[in-house]
């Protein structure tokens, strides 16, 4: 499973929010330019977030032209990373004569390398009502969640990402609209 971390603004009035805007794509961070993940796997994650918000009494604004009418906005970001590790290697010349045979003499150690893949899904909720007059440059993040861990292939990884969305909302019972 992915490790899920959540945090929130203790002063935010989650019960006062009624509507939310959630884009139809996930920002893929990590390159020189922003790219957007829009395939059926991205849509499944987005739909899972929408279902969690809807279940808590919020109404989704689907039309991007009307997103300024939303009380909160959700931004989903995804980062996949490969880490390459190269160690100094094994020398091989320190074994006892009686156990491994005679000392083999000195030679350069061969390097040992391996790599592993990780991925992180970040969910941020911003208060869009904080900029009623249109002058605020930075909107306050009222909820933050990240799910990180090893990246697996195919549907198993997709299932873990969707499960992490559910876990993030389970860890955040304060996200609930009062209608």
Task: Identify the meaning behind each predicted range.
Residues 76-131:
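Surface-exposed short loop/turn segments
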Residues 20-23, 73-77, 122-124, 143-146:
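Soluble periplasmic/extracytoplasmic beta-strand elements of cell-envelope proteins
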Residues 1-4, 9, 113-142, 147-179:
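C-terminal/domain-edge helix-coil "capping" segments
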Residues 2-24:
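Post-signal peptide N-terminal segment of mature Sec-exported envelope proteins
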Residues 24, 49-57, 78, 129, ...:
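Sec/Tat-exported extracytoplasmic proteins
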Residues 27-29, 79-83, 129-130, 148-152:
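Solvent-exposed loop/turn segments at secondary-structure junctions
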Residues 13-15, 65-70, 85, 113-118, ...:
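Extracellular/periplasmic catalytic domains that process cell-envelope and extracellular macromolecules
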Residues 25-77:
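N-terminal segment of the mature soluble domain
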């Amino acid at each position: 499973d992915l490790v899920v971390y959540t945090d929130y603004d203790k002063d935010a009035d989650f019960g006062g929010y009624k509507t939310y805007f959630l884009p139809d794509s996930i920002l893929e961070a990590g390159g020189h330019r922003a790219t957007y993940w829009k395939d059926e796997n991205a849509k499944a994650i987005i739909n899972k977030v929408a279902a969690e918000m809807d279940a808590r009494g919020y109404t989704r604004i689907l039309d991007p032209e009307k997103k300024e009418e939303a009380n909160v906005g959700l931004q989903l970001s995804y980062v996949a990373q490969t880490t390459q590790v190269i160690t100094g290697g094994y020398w091989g010349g320190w074994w006892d004569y009686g156990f491994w045979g005679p000392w083999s003499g000195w030679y350069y150690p061969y390097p040992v390398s391996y790599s592993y893949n990780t991925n992180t899904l970040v969910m941020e909720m911003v208060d869009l009502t904080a900029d009623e007059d249109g002058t605020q440059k930075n909107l306050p993040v009222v909820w933050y969640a990240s799910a990180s861990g090893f990246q697996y292939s195919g549907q198993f990884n997709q299932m873990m990402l969707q499960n992490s969305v559910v876990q993030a909302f389970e860890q955040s019972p304060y996200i609930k609209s009062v209608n």
